[in-house]
Curated annotation (Swiss-Prot):
Its main location: cytoplasm. GO terms for biological process: L-histidine biosynthetic process. It comes from Synechococcus sp. (strain CC9902). Keywords: Amino-acid biosynthesis, Cytoplasm, Histidine biosynthesis, Lyase. This is Imidazoleglycerol-phosphate dehydratase. Pathway: Amino-acid biosynthesis; L-histidine biosynthesis; L-histidine from 5-phospho-alpha-D-ribose 1-diphosphate: step 6/9. The gene is hisB.
Length: 201
């Protein structure tokens, strides 16, 4: 079972995440941030990852802490589920269109967290959601899962379309990278023979 479970409790939020990499795309997300719930559903549905996420946070102030802490917990649960990363493809990439928007995501389950973020979102908000929080979510996921993550916007003018295309591309790239490669026969996909949460490969 490639699963992860995290309970993150701070003075600002209380977040619980359960994640199953070998799921069927079932998602129950209740974070108090409706647009974030919608995007978490995209990760689950298109990545075929089962997600159960609940969060209670100081959203009466703004969504920043909840958004970031959900990203942290998702990243930690993903790292748990990957374990020593034996047998996975390791690399994944996808280009997702959504109407006029086109977003490319490439990632490496390297154990070396890094993000290169290239979205240009034309509005400050989508509904009540601050669009600057998109980057903060992915930074939190990458830093806590050990992903090297590159996000590029190739086209798009509608903020919702751009962000949703990004989450869909991330989901499909993650699915590609984390699926088991039968030709590896359980070997770690690194010439050094090890992939760790922090450290060079």
């Amino acid at each position: 079972m490639r699963t992860g479970e995290v309970h993150r409790h701070t003075g600002e939020t209380d977040v619980k995440v359960k994640l199953d990499l070998d799921g069927s795309g079932c998602c129950e997300a209740s974070t108090g941030v409706p647009f974030l719930d919608h995007m978490l559903n995209q990760i689950s549905s298109h990545g075929l990852i089962d997600l159960t996420i609940t969060a209670v946070g100081d959203t009466h102030i703004d969504d920043h802490h909840t958004n970031e802490d959900v990203g942290i917990a998702v990243g930690q649960a993903l790292s748990q589920a990957l374990g020593d990363r034996k047998g996975i493809h390791r690399f994944g990439h996808f280009v997702a269109p959504l109407d006029e928007a086109l977003v490319q995501v490439a990632l490496d389950c390297s154990g070396r967290p890094h993000i290169s973020y290239g979205l240009t979102i034309p509005t400050q908000k989508i509904g009540s959601y601050d669009t600057e929080l998109v980057k903060e979510f992915f930074v939190a996921v990458a830093n806590n899962s050990g992903l090297t993550l590159h996000i590029r916007q190739l086209d798009g003018v509608n903020s919702h379309h751009i962000v949703e295309a990004c989450f869909k591309a991330f989901a499909r790239a993650l699915r590609m990278a984390t699926e088991i490669d039968p030709r590896r026969a359980g070997a770690i996909p690194s010439s050094k023979g090890v992939l760790e949460q922090a450290g060079a490969n």
